[in-house]
Amino acid sequence: MQLKEKVIIPNDKLMSGGVKQYTLSNGRKITQITTFCPDIIGPGPTHLYLIDDGFLTLVDTGIPTHLAKKLFISWRDLEMAAMVDQLPHNHSQLELERGLAAVGYSIKDIELIILTHGHLDHFLMGNTIIEKSGAKVAAHVRDTERICNPWAVSRSVFEGRPRYKAMGMRLPMGTAEEYHQEILHETSSLSLKIDLPISRDGELSVNGYQSSFITVKHSPGHSPGSISLIIGDKEDQEKIMLCGDVMLYPITPHPDDLLTYLRTIDDLGQLKDISICLPAHGEPVYDLLGRTEFLKEHHRNRLDYTYRLSKEPKTVWEIASEPGYFDIVIDPENYNPMAGHEAYIHIKLLEIVKGVSQVKIDKGVYFYQNSGEPFDQVYSRICQLIDDRGITIL
């Protein structure tokens, strides 16, 4: 492999603040700058990527530190580690500025921001960058509602609370209205205007920004508008893929739509000449096909376990907090939307193929039970659904 890696600044004790540079065979460089985001109860530090292709491009922006602490810890009634509590409110911004300076740039040099998707840890620091640089923002049209709406975070609270209650999860202490007011105060000014909506695959070409070095591939499933960016010219025998949250290592992503996600993983496994996949969290993936096969097997096993756990009527939260369902212990007394949603999407895919069904509602909480048939028969129907791209689930 001709691709070269160089650590310029190592990560700190919270595994952020690091800068690493990847050099392609033709000498062009991709710089990874890692910014703070909580792990275990959050996705972990967020990698931002810097590409100099005639215009300086930043892929994803990270999240303001004070907001990351609230979203992933305080607003979930969780205890905050002293090391995290002591971080300055603009810690992630300082990490970005230090990372840019290490390779000869500053925030004002950024001309284009490309968002891999519309989740909070990927765009909420955008306005901080835009105010200093005047950068334009590009994102897939299918995630613009999440990114552009000043009330998107508040809306997720009002939509999420009844859903998580129906799963059987304990809700945070505050009322929806209390959270709404605080969230509006913190986030309503952080929505972004999408100057350059992406609507098709192929070489980056949006409103005057053109690049044969950056190829866009729509990769839905983690979110409707998730994209991957393949970095490298046609003559490059080895290419880098910036995959956002579609493919992570060693953790596994939390899909928004499991059926769509499994179709995307199939597609990514067919790509050629990808030497390394650089995700937005965690470690690089050096074996693209191997990782996609692992992810397919991982979700098959989780579907199987979900199916077996629902032999008797179970709530979504009972399944999610079952020991062994995740690699980490999920405390059933805690509020954990990511864990609840992960179990929910597996139940919903099983429900689509009639492997499980909703059998009762007790005090607003839904219970599911499996069909009693061998799981292999159920999974065969799931595989048929994945393979038949002509089927859209309403």
What does each model-found stretch correspond to?
Residues G18-V103, S228-V246:
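Conserved beta-strand hairpin/beta-sheet module of binuclear metal-dependent hydrolase folds
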Residues Q32, L50, P197-D236, I240:
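Core dinuclear metal-dependent hydrolase active-site scaffold
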Residues G44, L67-A68, R76-A81, L87-L94, ...:
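Active-site HxH/HxHxD metal-binding segment of metal-dependent hydrolases
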Residues D60, A135, H299-Y307, G340:
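Short, leucine-enriched amphipathic alpha-helices that occur as contiguous helical runs
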